[in-house]
Amino acid sequence: MSTSVPQGHTWTQRVKKDDEEEDPLDQLISRSGCAASHFAVQECMAQHQDWRQCQPQVQAFKDCMSEQQARRQEELQRRQEQAGAHH
């Protein structure tokens, strides 16, 4: 009986066709300002095919998204306070 070795992920970027809509997740990441760090994670995964070797890139992306979420939350709170002050 032979043992098969599990293959790593095949991480590839799809090429966007002109008539194809952009993926909502890609849109979200682009709007977040974290596209460069997300791309770094994708590049690392394509090169190493092992997420454990990409932890610095994953952490940088996580930090970027956390900062973006905090800024968004602050902006929403500020808008709610302004709306409440006008009433």
From Swiss-Prot:
Residue ranges of every copy of the CHCH domain listed in the record: 31-72
PROSITE patterns associated with the record: CHCH (PS51808)
Name the UniProt record assigns to this protein: Cytochrome c oxidase assembly factor 4 homolog, mitochondrial
Any GO BP: mitochondrial cytochrome c oxidase assembly
InterPro entries, per the entry: CHCH, Coa4-like
Similarity comment text for this entry: Belongs to the COA4 family.
Subcellular location: Mitochondrion
Compositionally skewed regions (Basic and acidic residues) per UniProt: 69-81
Region (Disordered): 1-25, 68-87
Residue spans of biased composition, Polar residues class: 1-13
One GO location term (cellular component): mitochondrial intermembrane space
Disulfide bonds: C34-C64, C44-C54
Renumbered ranges of motif Cx9C motif 1: 34-44
Record's keyword annotation contains tRNA processing: no
Short motif Cx9C motif 2, span: 54-64
Induction context: Up-regulated by estrogen.
Function: Putative COX assembly factor.
